Amino acid sequence: MASRPDGDVWNIVDNDKDSQHYGRNFKFDFSYISSEEIKDVGKDYVWQNYRVGNKVLKRLYDEIQNHFKWFSMFADTNSIHSLRKLNNINIDGFVSFLHTTIAPKRKRPLAYTSQKVALDTLKSVIRWCQIHRPNDVPATEIFTGNEYIGVNRKLKIDFIPDDVVAQINEALKKEENPYLKYGIIILQSTGMRIGDLLKLRIDCIKPHLISGYTIEWTQHKGRKDKAPMPVRSECVAAIEKLIEVTAELRSEADEKDKDTLMIWRVPQGRGTGSVSVISPQTFSQNWFRDFIKYNNIKDANGDYYNLTSHQFRRTLGTDMLSKGTNINVIQQVLGHSDPSVTKRFYADVKDKE
């Protein structure tokens, strides 16, 4: 498809074989944007970034379908029909709008992170236009850069406390869901992202040239293959168990999923009975929530621990730094694009412990 699609509704299939959403159809619906001028900018932003590969399709979908809608609502309320005349007063108004908006589904104020990502999406669209459509955006700077920096800023380091790790490990001994049990062991051992875990291949383990084994996987966020990394025997055993558990399902899986480790037979809901890759929501929301409550895993305040998949990644990095591991080695293990990214997340860990 060489030219921009017509109409307000686009169906674009992710044909990037390195994408964790390969084969998924993304339905873009721009009809919620009232202003034809702003709508045209939004369409161009999506199409041009997709066409040249600047952003993955899922990222563009989230930006336009989930995050940009808040600005569209603000624009409608304030009779804003163009990005060209936006100024800092409008941006302050948008921030106030985000502070006071009630999310329709949750019936609660927007979370701080949701507010920030809504503003970041607007920034991203305007920054792109400054290069590619300069006549459609303000010529002067309208963002101060500190709209969402302050007392409400979320602490970046979010590792799992040692006492909670101990509770998790004890609960894993009797966990009957093999995907959850062995998946957590893999996350603990490698620090990989949840999307990479769910797209792990059955041939990811290779013998090390000297001793033991290494693991390889595709880092979908950075769109590159991870360099072979030495891995503990527990992780190797976990992967072998999952290969064994899923062996009989492979003949029923789609061709693109036959060599994916985390396939299962969908027990209920859409696709019941079919064999497919486990979704991030099933693994890191539904299963984590049930795992924590069933095993009564609580934090220091006596509340159920709010476990996320990314915390295993942060915990691995924190443990390595606390043991004196060089920041560049941690960067390589976690697959950060640059050591500065690793330093930003982990430089002050010891002071916070």
Located regions from the model:
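Charge-rich, intrinsically disordered N-terminal extensions
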Residues: 1-145, 151-154, 167, 171-172, ...
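Extended accessory and catalytic-adjacent subdomains in large enzymes
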Residues: 142-353
